[in-house]
């Protein structure tokens, strides 16, 4: 006899109950970006996942990126994107547009999606409540011919140096869901554009989050046969980088996970944001759907 839709929902809720209890009153930081952000249906599924986490007693915090949207706006305004060593150079005019797109446009779109579920989301960036302070990022690149490292001047690209959790602690005790754009001030008065992955890691570390989820366009970390690795320790992750199993763009992603764990996060997950309801599938099922990296 086939199950009705209501029977299926009841069964799934019963299976999820132990995990709801496990994460009750725990903080989960979700870095939202990639393909999921540009797909309206996936966006709605993401918003409903965040709402259900809140309704289940979890303290969810969303950090988002927006690289493609920034590039599109710069093109629209006739501003050429400049890159050094594969990284965007952010001059004064560009950082103003970055802040406008991240904190003024994308942030409010995500807030609106969550609010449509009946929950209350609030849009923030690192400037609000002096939550995050940054400084100019120090990046170097090695010249392939001379093997000499040179310092890159990326303008107003920053890295987090301080997180004050006061505002986030206040929001955790309220009904509000923080949605945070990775823009922050420096002690020098400048505004800095910060990589969303590292920004999310800094927030999660400061809060000693139970989980940090990175929604990406890939299933997670794959072994040499292309199979998903369900769980890795920090030591195992280092070994897989050393032997070439983890390569290319996955290296900085995994290194960010490791940094977050060193900062105090209990576990970091790389998962596929192109899967509908990926957040719930990761948190409220026994084996999850991504790669969990633990100390």
From Swiss-Prot:
The record marks 31, 253 as: Transition state stabilizer. Its EC number is 2.7.2.8. It comes from the Bacteria. It is found in: Cytoplasm. The keyword Signal does not apply. Its main location: cytoplasm. The keyword Kinase applies. Gene3D superfamilies: Acetylglutamate kinase-like. GO terms for biological process: arginine biosynthetic process via ornithine; L-arginine biosynthetic process. Catalyzes the ATP-dependent phosphorylation of N-acetyl-L-glutamate. Belongs to the acetylglutamate kinase family. ArgB subfamily. This is Acetylglutamate kinase.
């Amino acid at each position: 006899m086939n199950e009705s839709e209501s029977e299926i929902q009841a069964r799934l809720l019963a299976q999820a109950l132990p995990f709801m209890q496990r994460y009750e009153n725990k903080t989960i930081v979700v870095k939202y970006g990639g393909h999921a952000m540009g797909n309206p249906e996936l966006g709605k599924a993401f918003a409903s996942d965040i709402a259900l986490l809140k309704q289940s007693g979890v303290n969810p915090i969303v950090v988002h990126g927006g690289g493609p949207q920034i590039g599109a706006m710069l093109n629209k305004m006739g501003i050429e994107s400049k890159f050094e060593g594969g990284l965007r150079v952010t001059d004064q005019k560009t950082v103003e547009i970055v802040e406008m797109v991240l904190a003024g446009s994308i942030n409010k779109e995500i807030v609106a999606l969550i609010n449509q579920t009946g929950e209350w989301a609030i849009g923030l960036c690192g400037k609000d409540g002096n939550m995050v302070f940054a400084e100019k990022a120090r990046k170097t690149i090695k010249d392939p011919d001379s093997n000499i490292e040179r310092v890159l001047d990326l303008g107003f690209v920053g890295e987090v140096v301080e997180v004050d959790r006061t505002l986030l602690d206040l929001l955790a005790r309220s009904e509000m869901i923080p949605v945070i754009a990775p823009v922050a001030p420096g002690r020098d008065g400048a505004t800095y554009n910060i990589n969303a992955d590292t920004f999310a890691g800094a927030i999660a570390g400061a809060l000693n989050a139970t989980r940090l989820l990175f929604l990406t366009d890939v299933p997670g970390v794959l072994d040499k046969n292309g199979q998903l690795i369900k769980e890795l320790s920090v030591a195992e992750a280092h070994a897989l980088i050393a032997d070439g199993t983890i390569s290319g763009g996955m290296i900085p992603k995994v290194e960010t996970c490791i940094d977050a764990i060193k900062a105090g996060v209990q576990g970091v997950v790389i998962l596929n944001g192109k899967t509908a309801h990926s957040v719930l599938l990761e948190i409220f099922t026994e084996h999850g759907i991504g790669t969990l990296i633990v100390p």
